[in-house]
Curated annotation (Swiss-Prot):
Transmembrane (T) component of an energy-coupling factor (ECF) ABC-transporter complex. Unlike classic ABC transporters this ECF transporter provides the energy necessary to transport a number of different substrates. Belongs to the energy-coupling factor EcfT family. One of its GO terms (cellular component) is plasma membrane. HAMAP family: EcfT (MF_01461). Keywords: Cell membrane, Membrane, Transmembrane, Transmembrane helix, Transport. The chain crosses the membrane at residues 30-50, 67-87, 110-130, 152-172, 247-267. It is found in: Cell membrane. It holds the Pfam family CbiQ. This is Energy-coupling factor transporter transmembrane protein EcfT. Forms a stable energy-coupling factor (ECF) transporter complex composed of 2 membrane-embedded substrate-binding proteins (S component), 2 ATP-binding proteins (A component) and 2 transmembrane proteins (T component). May be able to interact with more than 1 S component at a time. GO terms for molecular function: transmembrane transporter activity. The keyword Transport applies. Coiled coil: none annotated.
């Protein structure tokens, strides 16, 4: 098994979460992200963490793989926290200099954003790690099927999402390959000013975009050679079927959601 998992990567292991209907997992993930923004106070966040911990445990994907998937985003998290801490107002002022100030309100907002960011990323990673891209695309198409009545191109949207999810880990792997190649040539991405570091990213971005366009063109040629027609209804080898474990999982999600909103109201 690969030692890391990135958003968009499917990890083929046998687990309860892998066997659930992809439509249920997709709706649950979407609902989980929505209620994150309704969280208020330690108790509601504790429920969210417990729910996410249960999903991670049921997925049977090692924790170090989730950490490896979250690690590349640490700089985004750090930058977001720094902006919130230095430029948010409210509460007791601990330090002040010009437009920047460290306040209790800014620290609280930074912690909330940090918690939301990590929960959203990990929940999305659980979804993509336990659901193959094609099954996820089928789930999206199935859930969006009523929109066909108003002429929404559901098939094309589902295919685009499937391709995007498939390309995310591929592009990330290509970034790692290019970075290692540049480092082997003596390029140091960790030293120097911000401008210098950004300038050193150019040798990464150019081959990355060239490779992405080349892969997209190859994929388009392959799909055309196989007779893909976006206007035709696709057939599926594996049909989506709702089973008893899916109903049990849905009931658990509903119960946890009720507990979440009860805890929020009582705060």
């Amino acid at each position: 098994m690969n030692s890391r998992v990135l958003f968009g990567s499917f990890v083929p292991v046998d687990s309860v979460l892998h066997r659930l209907d992809p439509r249920l997992k997709l709706v649950t993930c979407f609902w989980y992200v929505v209620i994150i923004f309704f969280a208020k106070g330690p108790l509601t966040y504790l429920l969210l963490v417990a729910m996410l911990g249960a999903m991670i445990g049921l997925s049977k994907v090692p924790l170090k793989m989730y950490w490896a998937g979250l690690k590349p985003l640490l700089w985004v998290i750090g930058l977001t926290i720094a902006i919130q801490v230095l430029f948010s107002s409210g509460g007791h002022v601990y330090w002040h200099w010009g437009l920047m100030a460290i306040t209790s309100g800014g620290i609280n907002q930074a912690l909330v954003i940090l918690a939301r960011f990590i929960l959203i990323v990990l929940a999305s990673t659980v979804l993509t790690a336990t659901t193959p891209p094609l099954r996820l695309a089928d789930a999206i198409e199935s859930l969006m099927k009523p929109l066909k009545k108003i002429k929404v191109p559901v098939n094309q949207i589902a295919m685009m999402i499937s391709i995007a999810l498939r390309f995310i880990p591929t592009i990330m792997d290509e970034v790692n390959t290019i970075v290692k190649a540049q480092q082997a040539r003596g390029v140091d991405f960790t030293s120097g000013s911000v401008y210098t570091r950004v300038k050193r990213m150019v040798p990464i971005m150019v081959p990355l975009f060239v490779g992405a366009f080349r892969r997209a063109e190859d994929l388009a040629v392959a799909m055309e050679a196989r007779g893909y027609d976006p206007d035709q209804e696709r057939t599926r080898y594996r049909q989506l079927t709702w089973r008893r474990p899916d109903s049990i999982a849905l009931a658990v999600v509903v119960i946890v959601s009720v507990l979440f909103f009860v805890a929020r109201i009582l705060l």
